[in-house]
Structures are given as structure tokens and as C-alpha cells.
Amino acid sequence: MGKIIGIDLGTTNSCVAVMEGGKPRVIENAEGARTTPSVIAYQEDGEILVGAPAKRQAVTNPKNTLFAVKRLIGRRFDEKEVQKDIGLMPYTITKADNGDAWVEVRGQKLAPPQISAEVLRKMKKTAEDYLGEEVTEAVITVPAYFNDSQRQATKDAGRIAGLEVKRIINEPTAAALAFGLDKQEGDRKIAVYDLGGGTFDISIIEISEIDGEHQFEVLSTNGDTFLGGEDFDNRLIDFLADEFKKENGIDLRNDLLAKQRLKEAAEKAKIELSSSTQTEVNLPYITADASGPKHLVVKITRAKFESLVEDLIERSIKPCEVALKDAGVKVSDIQDVILVGGQTRMPKVQEKVKEFFGKEPRKDVNPDEAVAVGAAIQGGVLQGDVKDVLLLDVTPLSLGIETLGGVMTKLIQKNTTIPTKASQVFSTAEDNQSAVTIHVLQGEREMASGNKSLGQFNLTDIPPAPRGMPQIEVTFDIDANGILHVSAKDKATGKENKITIKANSGLSDEEIKRMEEEAAKYADEDKKLRELVDARNSADSAIHSVKKSLAEHGDKLDAAEKGAIEKAVQELEDVIKGDDKAAIESKTNALIEASQKLGEKVYAAGETESSAAEPGEPQEKTVDAEVVDAEFEEVKDDKK
């Protein structure tokens, strides 16, 4: 049985970890980094870049470089948060046929789960390269405050990437696992403050020792799925653009290339201001007008940056108050405060958290890696490798159905431990009503219209009866992933209808299957492209070696032999420009064969000459190197 890997699919960066010898280990990617930018670029030739290579070319390809796609996952196009992002993102956010927010790249409409799947595939490959075996199962984390549609969409992304998602777990819970696994300090209540690239979560978690078992029980969770480091970056971008406009009368936000350079600079400046009190943003040739090129040079102090984002930091405090109230604990009951997410490195954020909780946050948890580590631990629990750990998570939002008068009747209250099941009996509103529509909602508002609609289905063929007589039992069942299954049953006839909530939008199974096939096709094309590049490298190497040997020892061959080798070189040089791998390999072999005569001649000459002078030895090596070099290249290709 293969390993279950843990993946933190982040808005800005992603991370993968695995349990090894009872300890979680974060895995470095192909670029040698422990985190991978969640950036995907679609090239003109159809190639898809993921991670650092995609981020590097963002300035020159802003419209086709996608970042922060997690902010769109499982969301409707008309939601106000999505509308706000449309104005900020250099890429095109568009409305799908089902009303979801999708992205348009190079004339093709893509669903957010399809784009996120590219990042997951990179994480999968990173783990496979390290483990030396295929990986098919994963635990993927999501913000605790993600609703049902967003969780379902994340699961879909895993499927498209070729992963069976064994469990979806909440990011703060994962961080608590990473923090508390090796702590033998009895019962303690902790607060996990998770401010990432695009989302904010706060969870109050109790870690207890029960019969030698570590129990992690989430008491409450709250958050804001549209608050994160990206918003802090945007404040800096606006500030820089405004300063430049004041001075030069040009708004850089209207120029995609300039805006992308601003984004890069803002991110760097923000990071620098965590360790120094002032930084300078220096962007030469940012734009030009009739008077010539323009340069942007702006000094930013830490105090200035803090004043720009003060309200964003303040926005994170309200959910903390609600979470404490929901958990029924006082600030003084919290023993440890754990910071997760890169944005918590900002001194002002740490200061605000310290001020609210009245204690210094812990510094022994890596904010970038804790979530992936926790996911890997949960993978180990599911696999049976990690014993004595029990995780009790909660559903972040209340769930219910719409009843008479457009009211939301809650069946499951927020912060209920999952998995859980709840039933309630409802009846008809009209005489002789033969069908009822079950409209499933998620949220905290009293009226149905103020909450998120998760979907609806009908229960038909109810026997005619006066209003209020039929007994319709509605059952809500939330699984361990926090995904909802709903059934409605007519108690008189036993007739039942049930659905797993697929958001009234979301991806259908057919769409997911198509995207899986597309992903597999791309993987196949990538493999073919790599094999073609390897074949070209072998051919180049053979041409170089033979030409070198001809220049040094060509006079030992007669004209016909020399002509045959030159012809083989020419033929290989002609096919190397094309895309036919078989032709390149065949002509490479033909060249190696043709040049063997040269090798023999040189070898023979070397044998007859005196060993003192040893002119033959290096010559013999040169030709040998030519033959062996080509063979060596081929062996290396196979490994690839």
C-alpha cells in the first residue's frame, strides 16, 4: 500500500509532506524549495508551467499567469467577493454556464478545480520523486471556514490531479496536530490564528490526554475566506500606483505589465518590512510617455505600511471574539497561541494577536509548513502508522432547509463535531400537496435568502392529504470531510430521495472525468516532449564528438569514409530541428555506426605509435568518448 501524502493547497504557496519512520517530513520540490508558489502559467505552445518557473515569467505573460485561484474555488461569479477580484486580477474571470466563477486563458474556459489540480499534480510528482513510488492518495487541507461547495471543489481538484482524497481537513486543525503531536503536557486549550495568502481562520482547539490517547477536539472555528496576504499586497500596489500617478499623471494599474511588476515589488517590500523598518521600491523603466521613460522610486516605512493595512488586521479580530464566545472559553483559558500562514510574520499582526490574547504567540511552529505536516500526520492516522491520535473536527457553518415564509430552519448548528447526523420531521404547506422541494442552505442568517444555497431536490408522489398531515423526515448527514449528504423520506409510504450535496453549480462527474482525461493527456504530452528533448541532447552530443574527432583525425580516413560520416552528420543536423523523436534516434544511431570506422583507424594508429610520445592515447580517448558519450546519454534518457 502506497503512502498517503499531506498537501497544503494554499492561495499563495503550497507544501507537501509525508510520514517517514513515524515522523512527518516536508518534501523539497524539483527546484529545491520546501514550498511551491501556487502559480500556473499557460504558454503559447500549450506547455503549462507550475510553481517558481510560472512565477518567474509572470511579468511578461500577465494575462495567462494565474495566481490566488483558491479565492475562486467553489464560488459563484455574482458573489461580491468575486466581483471585487475581477478588478484586481490581471487574468480574465468569467461566468461559467452553471453560474460559477471560471477563468479564461488563451480562449479556453477553465474551472478553478482544474487549475488547482495543476498545483496538486506538481505536489504529487514532488512526493513521487522523493519516495520513488507512485502516490495515489492524499489528505488535502482547506480553510476551516470553507463552505460545502468549496470543500467539494477542492475534492474535485484532487480527483482531476489523479489523487484519491482520503480526507479533507481544516488548516488550523492540521496546524494543531503538527504542534501538539509530541507535546506531553496534559490537557490544554490552544488558539490557532491562521492568516494565509487568501483566507483567514481562527480555531479554538482542546488537546487532551484520554487513556493515553492524544485527542484534538475543535471547540469552535470562525474566519473570513476573503482576507489574506493578497489583500495586504493589493494595498501596497495601490499605494505605489497612487504615488506614481501623483508625480507623473499616469495610472500604472491600466498597464498589465507594469501592474505585474508592481505586484512583484509589493510582495518583496512587504516581506522586507517584516525584518527592517524601511525599504525602497525601485522599478526602472516602469512605463514611458512622450517625454521619455519613467522610473518608479518610492520609499516605504514599516509605519506607513501598517497604516495602509490597519483595517485588514482589525478585521481578523472580530472572528477571534466570536470563536471564543462559541467555544464558551475566556481569553485567559487559552494556554498557547499558534500563528500559521506567511502573513503572520508581519510584526504588527503578531503584536495585535498578542494584545488580543494577552500572551506571546508561540514561535516554535513553522507558519509555512505546519499545515502540510498536520495533513501528513492525518494521513498517517488513516493509514494506521500513527497511533493514539483522535481528531474531532467541526462544521464551520450551520446547515438547514428553507421552510414556510422563506425562513431557514437549522438542522445542524455551527461548530457541531463531525461526522454527525440530524433528522427533523416537516410537513406540507398546502392541501393535497404531492411534492415538496428540499432547499438546502448553509449559513447563520435567519432568512433563507441571506444564506448560501447548497442545492435542492424534490420528493414526489406524496399521497393527497390535508396540509400539515404528511410526515416528511429530512436527514442531514455530514461525513468526516465536512461534506453533506441529505435525504428526505415520506414516513407514510417509505418513499425516499437522497443526494450528496453537489452545489447547485459545481462540476458534474462528466466534467471531472473530462478534466481528468485532459490532465492525463497533458502528462503524456509532457513525457513525450521530455523524451524528444532528451533525444535532441543525445544527437547534439554525438554531432559534437564526431565533428571534433573528424577535425583531429579526419586525415586518417579515405574520402569515401569521410564523406559517409559527413553525410550522416548532415542528415542528423537536418532531423534534429524537427519533432520526430524516432527519426532523431535512428539518425543518431546511424551517425554512431558511421563514425566507428574513424574510431577503429585512430585506435589502430595509436597502437602502432610509440607509447613514449603517447600521441595516440588521448586521440583514442577522444573517439572513445564520442562513442561512449552517445551511449551514456541514452542510458540517462531511459532513467528520465
From Swiss-Prot:
SUPFAM superfamilies reported for this sequence: Actin-like ATPase domain, Heat shock protein 70kD (HSP70), C-terminal subdomain, Heat shock protein 70kD (HSP70), peptide-binding domain
Modified residues (Phosphothreonine): T199
Region of interest called Disordered, as start-end residue ranges on this chain: 603-640
Protein name per Swiss-Prot or TrEMBL: Chaperone protein DnaK
Induction comment: By stress conditions e.g. heat shock.
Organism annotation: Methylobacillus flagellatus (strain ATCC 51484 / DSM 6875 / VKM B-1610 / KT)
Family statement drawn from the similarity comment of this UniProt entry: Belongs to the heat shock protein 70 family.
UniProt keywords, alphabetically: ATP-binding, Chaperone, Nucleotide-binding, Phosphoprotein, Stress response
GO molecular function: ATP binding; ATP-dependent protein folding chaperone; unfolded protein binding
GTP-binding among keywords: no
